[in-house]
Amino acid sequence: MNSQLVNPPHAFNYIESQRDEYQLSHDLTEIILQFPSTAAQLTARLSRSCMKIDHCVIEYRQQVPINATGSVIVEIHDKRMTDNESLQASWTFPLRCNIDLHYFSASFFSLKDPIPWKLYYRVSDTNVHQRTHFAKFKGKLKLSTAKHSVDIPFRAPTVKILSKQFTDKDVDFSHVDYGRWERKPIRCASMSRVGLRGPIEIRPGESWASRSTIGVGQSEGESEIENELHTYRDLQRLGASVLDPGESASIVGANMAQSNITMSVAQLNELVRTTVQECIKSNCNSSQPKNFK
């Protein structure tokens, strides 16, 4: 295939594949895309460049009866990922809907590896026989190269519906989310200095997580000094009911001082006098003499 670099020299023209007929299949079937020629890829590789897809257009043109039903699912996969994580974007649209699918890549790939992108289709819930040549697909790719990768602003996939009897309510498309990242701190012997005031400086034998206050919980080997500096750390993990100390001592004392029992001075004196007499009586009574036989 003839393919040339365009001006500026780091961008390729749109590379079009042949508009070929494809057989109806319920299983994922590859759509052949045309990529830059081996010579063009070798030129970019010799310049130590990496490559990305700027824009990919997949043209779908149906050739089925008007009473045909079913849905077509088109998927773009990145084969650098494991099989269950390779899906990058997907579209679902009616079998009889002529449509253009648009995809914009968000990553570079090395020219030392095989081109990783693969395009697949399958048909579901249809009344058309399998292996019927139900449609034609055509792919158009625009790629570019760079000396090194840079962050690429995300552009969502989209569609252009060409059949008037269908609207955007009849199609759906999606894109994979960003991969999750969880920092895993490097454990080191100097973690006893975590939390000390002052500018953070990484020293030999230390990691950023161990020096910063945003690191995760410390290991079992941390020093006693660290425990003394952070006596009450991780208390936020307890529930509010556990951390609530209850009413203060002043409130408790005030509540105890408040009573519904009232006594006059005379009644209080009588109570004290009676109590004292009972105590004297119980302590001063002589014991009964024992009889010896």
Swiss-Prot record:
It comes from the Viruses. Keywords: DNA-binding, Host cell membrane, Host endoplasmic reticulum, Host membrane, Host microsome, Membrane, Phosphoprotein, Transport, Viral movement protein. It is a peripheral membrane protein. Phosphorylated. Signal peptide: none annotated. One of its GO terms (cellular component) is host cell endoplasmic reticulum membrane. It is found in: Host cell membrane; Host microsome membrane; Host endoplasmic reticulum membrane. GO terms for biological process: transport of virus in host, cell to cell. It holds the Pfam family Gemini_BL1. InterPro entries: Gemini_BL. One of its GO terms (molecular function) is DNA binding. Its main location: host cell. Coiled coil: none annotated. The keyword Membrane applies. Transports viral genome to neighboring plant cells directly through plasmosdesmata, without any budding. The movement protein allows efficient cell to cell propagation, by bypassing the host cell wall barrier. Begomovirus genome is shuttled out of nucleus by Nuclear shuttle protein (NSP) and the movement protein transports the DNA-NSP complex to cell plasmodesmata and facilitates further movement across the cell wall. Binds to dimeric supercoiled plasmid DNA. Belongs to the begomovirus movement protein BC1 family. This is Movement protein BC1. It comes from Potato yellow mosaic virus (isolate Venezuela) (PYMV).
